[in-house]
Amino acid sequence: MHLMYTLDAQGKRIYTLKKMTEDNEITKSAHPARFSPDDKYSRQRVTLKKRYNLLPN
């Protein structure tokens, strides 16, 4: 089982192990995406983010 979360009315995370809430909303994974040092496309991703001003200042 993986740790999942959903947001409450105040925007705080509510953690659960279920894939769906009682209101039939899909929960989100609480784990970050995997990182690979062998990422072949990181240069292209950074170039696109710079082009469209998506990088933090």
UniProtKB/Swiss-Prot annotation:
Signal as UniProt keyword: no
Region of interest called Disordered, as start-end residue ranges on this chain: 22-42
The answer on whether this UniProt entry bears the keyword Cell membrane reads no
Please provide an example of a Pfam family that matches this protein in its UniProt record.
Nop10p
Tell me the Gene Ontology biological-process terms attached to this UniProt entry.
positive regulation of telomerase RNA localization to Cajal body; rRNA pseudouridine synthesis; snRNA pseudouridine synthesis
List the record's Gene Ontology CC terms alphabetically.
box H/ACA snoRNP complex
What is the top-level taxon of the source organism?
A: Eukaryota
In which compartments does the protein localize?
Answer: Nucleus, Nucleolus
The UniProt entry, under InterPro entries, shows: H/ACA_rnp_Nop10, H/ACA_rnp_Nop10_sf
* The protein's role, per its UniProt record: Non-catalytic component of the H/ACA small nucleolar ribonucleoprotein (H/ACA snoRNP), which catalyzes pseudouridylation of rRNA and is required for ribosome biogenesis. This involves the isomerization of uridine such that the ribose is subsequently attached to C5, instead of the normal N1. Pseudouridine ('psi') residues may serve to stabilize the conformation of rRNAs. The H/ACA snoRNP complex also mediates pseudouridylation of other types of RNAs. The H/ACA snoRNP complex mediates pseudouridylation at position 93 in U2 snRNA.
Assembly notes = Component of the small nucleolar ribonucleoprotein particles containing H/ACA-type snoRNAs (H/ACA snoRNPs).
Similarity-based family: Belongs to the NOP10 family.
UniProt protein name: H/ACA ribonucleoprotein complex subunit NOP10
**Gene, per the UniProt record:** NOP10
